[in-house]
From Swiss-Prot:
Activity is not affected by 2,3-bisphosphoglycerate. Belongs to the BPG-independent phosphoglycerate mutase family. It is an enzyme of class 5 (isomerase). Its cofactor is Mg(2+); Mn(2+). This is 2,3-bisphosphoglycerate-independent phosphoglycerate mutase.
């Protein structure tokens, strides 16, 4: 078992951002003597949103992503960001599974199909990803490429499909590569409620060309004719543009939607045995290979271009590897965050990791009991601090976030004050039992309770969050050389204070120096 230089108590406040705007700021306007003292004593604001935490640029942080980054000690990129970076950096051509698909096609029948939702809605897919895949497959010298266009009209205007089709036609013509083979609405291609009769319409079209036959030069007029009859993008019945572009024995199919829920049924029918449920008269092609953009379901047998990343040696695992004991505590609303998410997105409880769940109050909305169970969480933490059994203990305080979401400003002020009182009690116990108290937050919320139009603001924010350290043996750096400080730096900083080495997998940096 490793020896530690200092024992650490980490508090993660949910929804506590930093803002100088006083209007509607439940944090600035609340009485928070403890956090005021800790921030004045030794602290540095850190980033908790957007690319800093692996989310798309400019997107506000959330509790799941926040705790994942805090516990992992690295930026954990979401699937969409990993894909966007590959597209932006033109590295799709180096993707292992895409190269394998290309090799399979070249050695086999020479054919690959790209299937997915073609729009810029950005909820399930993005047309830019399709363009990047076409370019990459051309570079990989796949002889024949067929594209199956699923119409959107839900995350985009109901009649915007002709515009996206024109963009695709122009791109294919410019590249002189690829052939658009099928057009079908997402109503048939992307069902998620086991309405197999809908999926069958898409299935029969992809394999057997069941649908209205036309040519690519007439496709836009055909769709406009459908619009005139109130058949919009989502509900487009199959339009077949190429007999050669049907899915055949030995073909490779790549589905390019990154969101899983509406890809499961169609991919399971094309790539596994589920097609039998469709009761289709069409003969299922032999030896087809299906590939997803992401993992659509853990049980599916086919690969993904961007499989889930496993996060080895997150803080909790590393402490366990070093033979140290730890304690994680939260009330019901945030229990998953201090366990599953903090531990790198795994259910597993590591060796010598103790957990404690404090029940959240049973009220209709938390503005009715703004302190929530903050006192109960503090009680459990103080018990552990007095035991001095663990090298590392951590907890989450839910009130600023959960009450912030109600939009009730006065209640949010009370939530913030209750949280400050709870942290104060923990701080006293830390001093008594020789623990270093470190406080941070997963994202902002309660500092913005009023929207620009004067209405309630109930969402998270993109504001910085505090990161404090109660020991003056450690001083925060002014800045990092190459980037802003962010949540990924919390775990490495905790390890620095504990006096432990960092695992190689942690790419975050300790942001304190010993003085």
């Amino acid at each position: 078992m490793s020896e530690v230089k200092n024992r650490v108590c980490l508090v993660v406040i949910d929804g506590w951002g930093i803002s100088n705007e006083s209007k509607g700021n439940a944090i600035l306007n609340a009485k928070t003597p403890v956090m005021d003292e800790l921030c004045a004593l030794n602290s540095h604001p850190i980033e908790a949103h957007g690319l800093h935490v692996g989310l798309p640029e400019g997107l506000m942080g959330n509790s799941e992503v926040g705790h994942l980054n805090i516990g992992a000690g690295r930026v954990v990129y979401q699937d969409i960001v990993r894909i966007n970076l590959a597209v932006k950096n033109k590295t799709l051509v180096e993707n292992k599974h895409l190269k394998e698909a290309a090799e399979r096609a070249i050695k086999g029948n020479g054919r690959i199909h790209l299937c997915g939702l073609v729009s810029d809605g950005g909820v399930h897919s993005h047309i830019d990803h399709l363009f990047a895949l076409i370019t990459a497959l051309k570079q990989l010298k796949v002889p024949q490429l067929y594209i199956h266009f699923f119409g959107d009209g839900r995350d985009t205007s109901p009649t915007s499909g002709v515009g996206f089709l024109q963009q695709l036609i122009d791109f294919v013509n410019k590249e002189q590569y690829g052939e658009i083979a099928t057009i079908v609405g997402r109503y048939y291609a992307m069902d998620r409620d086991k309405r197999w009769e809908r999926i069958r319409v898409c299935y029969d079209a992809l394999i057997a060309g069941v649908g209205e036959k036309t040519t690519i030069d007439k496709a836009i007029d055909v769709i406009k004719g459908r619009y005139a009859k109130d058949e919009t993008d989502e509900f487009l019945k199959p339009i077949i543009l190429s007999d050669k572009g049907r899915t055949k024995d030995g073909d490779t199919l790549i589905f390019f939607d990154y969101r899983a829920d509406r890809m499961r049924e169609i991919t399971e029918c094309m790539g596994m045995e589920r097609y039998k449920d469709l009761k289709s008269d069409i003969k299922h092609p032999k030896d087809m290979q299906v590939i997803g953009m992401t993992q659509y379901k853990a049980e599916f047998t086919f690969p993904a271009l961007f499989p889930p990343e496993s996060h080895k040696n997150v803080l909790a695992e590393w402490l366990s590897v070093k033979g140290l004991t730890q304690f994680h505590c939260a009330e019901t609303e945030k229990y998953a965050h201090v366990t599953f998410f903090f531990n790198g997105g795994v259910e597993k409880q590591f060796e010598n990791e103790e957990r404690c769940l404090v029940p959240s109050p049973k009220v209709a909305t938390y503005d009715l009991e703004p302190a929530m169970s903050s006192a109960g969480v503090a009680d459990k933490m103080i018990e552990q601090l007095n035991r001095k059994a663990h090298a590392f203990i951590m907890c989450n305080f839910a009130p600023p976030d959960m009450v912030g979401h109600t939009g009730v400003y006065e209640a949010a002020v009370k939530a913030v004050e209750a949280t400050d009182i709870a942290i104060g009690r923990i701080y006293e116990a830390c001093k008594k039992n020789d623990y270093v108290l470190m406080v941070t937050a997963d994202h902002g919320n309660a500092e913005k309770m009023i929207a620009p139009d004067g209405g309630k603001h109930t969402a998270h924010t993109c504001n910085l969050v505090p990161f404090t350290c109660s020991s003056l043996k450690f001083k925060f750096m002014d800045k990092l050389p190459d980037r802003e400080m962010a949540l990924c730096d919390v775990a490495p900083t905790v390890l620095k204070v504990l006096g432990l080495p960092l695992p190689s997998e942690m790419t975050g940096k300790p942001v304190v120096i010993e003085v």
